[in-house]
From Swiss-Prot:
Name of the protein described by the UniProt record: FK506-binding protein 2
Function text: PPIases accelerate the folding of proteins. It catalyzes the cis-trans isomerization of proline imidic peptide bonds in oligopeptides.
Domain PPIase FKBP-type residue range list: 43-132
GO cellular component term, pick one: endoplasmic reticulum
Localization annotation: Endoplasmic reticulum
Keyword terms, alphabetized: Endoplasmic reticulum, Isomerase, Rotamase, Signal
Family named by the database record: Belongs to the FKBP-type PPIase family. FKBP2 subfamily.
Gene: FPR2
Enzyme Commission number: 5.2.1.8
Database matches in SUPFAM superfamilies: FKBP-like (SSF54534)
Signal sequence extent: 1-19
Reactions mediated catalytically: [protein]-peptidylproline (omega=180) = [protein]-peptidylproline (omega=0)
Organism lineage: Eukaryota, Fungi, Dikarya, Ascomycota, Saccharomycotina
GO BP term, example: chaperone-mediated protein folding
């Protein structure tokens, strides 16, 4: 049993090291919402808890959970990396998603300081906490 577990762990790390570069955004749902009355759409102000990791090493580089405050941004207005604008779109409050973001939709060839190297593919574990939508006046 220990041998099988050890072999599985080794195989996991080998696959991570030799994994090909991502060419497109890959989104996986990790937590279904209990009820979905509203889905995040362009122009909504969303609040998202997240943990960000480098895909190659699995190293965590940032987490809103450590600060106890989710990030808040206007969806679809380039206030965050493109992979987030695309990956959060259509989420429901309480939904969890894993975003596998290619470098082109992340920080690209410039990276992000000493935290994210150039051309790094990223993985974000996300949970949509809130959606604020501007009310539409139905009365004319």
């Amino acid at each position: 049993m220990k041998f099988t577990t050890g072999l599985s762990v080794l195989l996991f790390f080998v696959l991570q090291v030799f994994a090909e570069k991502l060419t497109e955004l890959v989104v996986g749902v990790t937590k279904e919402p209990v009820d979905c009355k509203i889905k995040a759409s362009k122009g909504d102000v969303v609040s998202v808890h997240y943990t960000g990791k480098l895909r190659d090493s699995g190293e965590i580089f940032d987490s809103s959970y450590n600060r106890g405050v989710p990030i808040q941004f206007k969806l679809g207005y380039s206030q965050v990396i493109s992979g987030w604008d695309q990956g959060i779109l259509g989420m429901c409050i309480g939904e969890g998603r894993t975003l596998h973001i290619p470098s082109e939709l992340g920080y690209g060839s410039r990276g992000a300081g000493s935290v994210i190297p150039p051309d790094a593919d990223l993985i974000f574990e996300t949970e949509l906490v809130d959606i604020q939508r501007e009310a539409v006046d139905d009365e004319l």
